[in-house]
């Protein structure tokens, strides 16, 4: 599983928070860790880097 994704779900009392469906399924069905890549997140990142060239420069320096 991607290291930057939380292993626990947020507290629903806090209000609307983005919920990772893979984490929810993993907890609901006691699934083992899987190597999952969020394709839509990658596409959004690529679009942001294309839209903002300065952001792309910072990403290359890292």
From Swiss-Prot:
Q: Which chain positions lie within coiled-coil regions?
A: none
Keywords attached to this Swiss-Prot or TrEMBL record, sorted alphabetically, are: Cellulose biosynthesis
Q: What InterPro entries does this protein map onto? A: CBP_BcsR (IPR024487)
Quote the disruption phenotype from the UniProt entry: Not required for cellulose synthesis in strain 1094. When disrupted in a cellulose-synthesizing strain (W3110 derivative with a functional bcsQ gene), cellulose is no longer made.
The UniProt record's further free-text remark is:
Cellulose production is abolished in E.coli K12 / MG1655 and W3110 due to a premature stop codon in bcsQ.
Task: Write out the GO biological process terms.
Answer: bacterial cellulose biosynthetic process
Instruction: Tell me yes or no: is Transcription among this UniProt entry's keywords.
Output: no
Q: What induces it?
A: Part of the yhjR-bcsQABZC operon, it is expressed about 5-fold higher than bcsQ (when the latter has a restored reading frame). Expressed in mid-log phase, expression increases dramatically as cells enter stationary phase, the increase is dependent on rpoS.
Keyword match Transferase: no
Name listed for the protein in its UniProt record: Protein YhjR
């Amino acid at each position: 599983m991607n290291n930057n994704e939380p292993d626990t779900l947020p507290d629903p009392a806090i209000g609307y928070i983005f919920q990772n469906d893979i984490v929810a399924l993993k907890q609901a069905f006691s699934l083992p860790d899987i190597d999952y890549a969020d394709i839509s997140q990658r596409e959004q990142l690529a679009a942001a880097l294309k839209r903002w060239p300065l952001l792309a420069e910072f990403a290359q320096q890292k």
